[in-house]
């Protein structure tokens, strides 16, 4: 198995290559990642909803040693990444980070939320700082209201912003 610090650097180079091939190539890759991730999260969402998402990201928090806070209420899950280990590893590298590295998270999570009827608001805040806020809502009106507070709102394949 490839160590995570090598994996994220490899991912960064793959993203840069695909970006050089055009937006369609990059989005196709993100959609492939999304389909793969369905094996890990789709059943949790379909059977447990927001609680299943909370379970999934709690496991990721431990597995990837993330400095993140999770907050769950009846209509919303908020994931506040205080220090993203993935972007941190990419930035601690002699190769230039892909300018849109953070976009891959929305690129795989967004299509799953669309598929399951949830509404995602993904605020990267600043692509050069390893932090973000992901909010997932049951209610589309609450999601639209939350979008107004985002500093750098992300889109994903099938949902463009801006």
Q: Each PLM stretch: what is its role?
A:
Residues 1-103, 114, 119-133, 137-162:
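N-terminal accessory segment detector
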């Amino acid at each position: 198995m490839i160590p995570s610090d090598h994996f994220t650097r490899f991912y960064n180079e793959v993203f840069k290559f695909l970006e050089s091939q055009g937006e369609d190539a990059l989005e196709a890759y993100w959609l492939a990642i999304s389909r793969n991730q369905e094996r890990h999260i789709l059943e949790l969402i379909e059977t447990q909803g927001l609680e299943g998402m909370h379970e999934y990201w709690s496991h990721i928090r431990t597995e990837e040693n993330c400095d993140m806070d999770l907050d769950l209420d009846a209509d919303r899950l908020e994931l506040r990444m205080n220090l993203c280990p993935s972007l941190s590893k990419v930035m601690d590298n002699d190769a230039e980070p892909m300018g849109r590295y953070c976009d891959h998270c929305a690129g795989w999570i967004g299509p799953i939320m669309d598929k399951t009827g949830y509404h995602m608001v993904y605020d990267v805040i600043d692509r050069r700082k390893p932090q973000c806020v992901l909010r997932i809502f049951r209610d589309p009106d609450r999601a639209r209201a939350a979008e107004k507070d985002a500093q750098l709102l992300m889109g994903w394949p099938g949902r463009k912003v801006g």
